[in-house]
Amino acid sequence: MNQIAARTTSTNVTQVDNYKKGELFEEYIIKLFNEQFFYLNKWRKSTPYADGQISGDLWNPDIEMELVFSGKKRYRFAVECKWRKEFTDGKIFWARDEQIVSYRIFQDQWRIPVFVAIGIGGAPDNPERLFLTPLNNIYMHNELYESDLIPYKRKPTSRFYYDFIQLKLF
C-alpha cells in the first residue's frame, strides 16, 4: 500500500516539476522579445491539470505576440515552447500528434504563423542550445533529429527579430 502511495506521490511531484520547467522556459523565451517592439498578447502558462483533463486553451501555442510599430499595423504570431534536457539517440520527442494537429488548426483558424522554440540542455531558464523553427517545417514529425534542427539554431541569448514581410521569426 505504501509503495503505491509513494509511487503516486512521486509521479505527481515529477508532473509538477515538469510543468515548472515548462513555465521557466516560456518565461525565458518571453524575455528574448524586446518590450519596446513586441507586445505579449497571451501567455498560456504551463500548469498541472487535475484528473488528466486539459483545458481547451492549453491545446494552443504557449505564447501569442504582436510586433508593434507606432501608428502602424500590428503583426501577430504565436510561439510554442519546448525544453528538453538532451537529445536521446540524436533526437527528441517534441509533441504528441494531437498537440501538433491543434497547433496547425490554431495557425489556420487565426491565420497567424506559429513557431516552435526548442531549448536543449542547460536549464529551462538558460538553455545551452536554442532552435527556432516555423511549425510548417516540422508538423509532419513528432520526433525531431538534431541534424534536422541545425538550420534553425540560434544564439540562446540573442533577442528575437520578426520579419513581417517574410513572416519569419529570427
What kind of feature is each model-predicted range?
Residues 21-29, 98-102:
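Conserved alpha-helical elements of sugar-nucleotide-dependent glycosyltransferases
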Residues 31-58, 62-66:
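A short acidic/basic microdomain associated with nuclease active sites
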Residues 33, 61-87:
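Conserved catalytic cores of phosphodiester-cleaving nucleases, focusing on short active-site segments
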